[in-house]
A protein has these predicted regions:
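Extracytoplasmic metal-acquisition and chelation regions
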Residues: 1-224
Length: 224
């Protein structure tokens, strides 16, 4: 039974070196090669775009924990019971986190569900929690967006009545375009965590909750 059809053109050579050893298949058919997909495929999350930020969906995090448990059990069978116990504990914590997030995002006004950001890394967040990626402008040193791109993004903000524009935590200081756009459109700016942690959000759950509370605060909704 075919679950996901993977085209042969995605088969790529695995780079030499020990750092990539884990990618090498033991099967003789594709030894030294690996299927390089556009994004991680977990369950129904198939967006057709490059988005490695699977952790922005708690169900994806749960799937990752199970993969880690299985890998540890395979490498260390004597610890199987301990890995299973710890996994069960983590799963309960993730279920509680997921419930909190759904409560916060579920209370958002419709317009606040449209995200305009500096980082196209929130598609799993959007698909899991009922949000929509309305637009983004990457904070890149390689060049500024064109006038047409800026005008199009501003129309998006105005037409959808987007209450805020979100900057990425790691590139907030390099996001003058969106900061200026927010000022012109007279909407708020918020800062979201993408792939970093800090003293305010040193752990996964705190990072996820911080993003949810930021979006709720910028929308004018109470995050509890």
């Amino acid at each position: 039974r075919t679950v996901v059809a993977v085209p042969s053109r995605t088969l790529q050579e695995v780079p030499a070196g020990g750092s990539y050893r884990f990618l090498r298949s033991g099967a003789s058919e594709h030894r030294g090669q690996v299927y390089l997909l556009a994004q991680a495929v977990l369950g129904k999350h198939v967006h057709g775009e490059i988005d490695p930020h699977i952790w922005h969906s708690v169900p994806n995090a749960k799937a990752s924990v199970q993969v880690i448990r299985d890998a540890l059990t395979s490498a260390d069978p004597t610890g199987a019971s301990e890995y299973a116990t710890r996994t069960e504990q983590v799963m309960k914590e993730l279920d509680a986190l997921d419930a909190q997030l759904r409560q916060v995002y579920g209370a958002l006004p419709e317009a606040a569900r449209n995200l305009v950001t500096t980082h196209d890394g929130y598609r799993y967040l959007a698909s899991t929690y009922g949000l929509h990626i309305a637009g983004f402008v990457s904070a890149s040193a390689s060049g500024e967006p064109s006038i047409q791109q800026r005008q199009r993004l501003r129309r998006t903000v105005e037409d959808l009545k987007v209450p805020a524009i979100y900057l990425d935590k790691s590139t907030a200081m390099r996001s003058p375009v969106l900061t200026e756009l927010a000022r012109e459109a007279q909407v708020r700016t918020g800062v979201l965590y993408s792939d970093t942690l800090d003293a305010q959000a040193p752990h996964y759950a705190q990072m996820m909750l911080a993003n949810a509370h930021t979006i709720a605060l910028c929308s004018g909704a109470s995050s509890g």
